[in-house]
Amino acid sequence: MTSKQLKLVIITGMSGAGKTVAMQSLEDLGYFCVDNLPPSLLPKFWELMKESDKMDKIALVMDLRGREFFDSIEPALDELDNTNFITTKILFLEADDKVLVSRYKETRRHHPLEPNGSVLDGINAERELLSDLKGRSQLVINTSNMAPRELRERINNEFQTEDKDVFNVQLMSFGFKYGIPIDADLVFDVRFLPNPHYIDKMRPLTGLDEDVYEYVMKWPETQTFLDKLVDLLMFTLPFYKREGKTQLVIAIGCTGGQHRSVALTEFVGKAIQQKYETTISHRDMKRRKGR
């Protein structure tokens, strides 16, 4: 039996306050997420998680959809408090009555406590029933004035670990003749640069070979472009991260994806990885190698 420590976040609170956004944010942070687990199943669930080597961060959404919620949530939490291998944090999301009513009207949903009655009556009943749980929560967030992006940013600030940057930049070279990568967020065309393909000895090589790399890099327009591109990315990447993105795919393309785009992708990747977790790949480099 393993003695590892599990981190548990219980997401709860008012219906319509943003629990789904919170769960998605924690999932992006590497949490194993379960939506609407009945409280009575918590002890068995913990034992299973404790035996897993792949799960050490868990987030559970627990709310009124669980019919036994109010009867069993308090005993389940008391049992967790006495469990030495789990560190528990309760995240309680709330919003003002006026805001919750407005959100229900926008989505045309009924309140779970008043499926055939007044939304406001359901909100008032839910708020009263959740008052004790709110009191024992370690983190309470009022989302009345928050857009989903702002809630994601708040969740990231509260829960991301210091030893892991959850924002990953993927640099990819490609050849336009084979199509633009469908998963690219940003695409840069470097076909304006001198092409080593027309030099016989370089034709079978790639941008990873020293001769090709130096040839591509020697041109003033290459250096000017790289200076501007790296500057642009260093300026914009923090804002993509702020928007809640956990991954950004940047594609750099030339004609065949063998020479220019490969060399520039290597250069840009090495510059970006000084600050961000970065993955470098060359989609089309081997298609023509040796021909």
From Swiss-Prot:
Give a GO molecular function annotation for the protein.
ATP binding
Residues reported in the UniProt entry to bind ATP: 13-20
Recite the UniProt keywords alphabetically: ATP-binding, GTP-binding, Nucleotide-binding
What Pfam families has UniProt attached to this entry?
A: PapZ_C, RapZ-like_N
- Family, as annotated: Belongs to the RapZ-like family.
| Function text | Displays ATPase and GTPase activities.
Q: What name does UniProt use for this protein? A: Nucleotide-binding protein LMHCC_0126
